[in-house]
């Protein structure tokens, strides 16, 4: 993943932050431009406090099921955007949503749904 805005007009690209417990290949496109920092800590509160001391005022988290669940359980999320592909995950795919881990269990409600080509985009907001 490149994790940038791919549009045909000038735009401020997001700063990139990698949260990982593993070694990572530094030759990936992800690291080529506007790279900010790598955090190997598991302490989300410490990481977010560190980011709050910079010019970052909001973050977009693109994560797998474990990290996404960590953000939700710590109540660091106010909006969830889910893209559902029409393609199957395959044998080794990890599904995040199941009955015990439904997004509604974290206090979110579905606000809108959009069809984008063959995919579905759903936006959930914190139900306060």
Predicted regions, residues:
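Enzymes that bind and transform nitrogen-containing heteroaromatic metabolites
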Residues: 1-128
């Amino acid at each position: 993943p490149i994790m940038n805005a791919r549009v045909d007009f000038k735009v401020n690209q997001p700063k990139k932050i990698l949260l990982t417990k593993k070694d990572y290949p530094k030759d990936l496109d992800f690291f080529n431009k506007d790279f900010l920092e790598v955090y190997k800590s598991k302490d989300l509160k410490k990481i977010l406090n560190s980011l709050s001391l910079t010019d970052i005022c909001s973050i977009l988290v693109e994560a797998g099921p474990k990290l996404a669940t960590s953000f939700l359980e710590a109540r660091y999320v106010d909006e969830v955007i889910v893209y559902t592909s029409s393609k199957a995950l395959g044998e080794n795919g990890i599904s995040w949503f199941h009955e015990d881990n439904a997004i509604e269990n974290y206090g979110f409600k579905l606000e809108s749904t959009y069809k984008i080509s063959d995919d579905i985009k759903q936006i959930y907001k914190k139900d306060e």
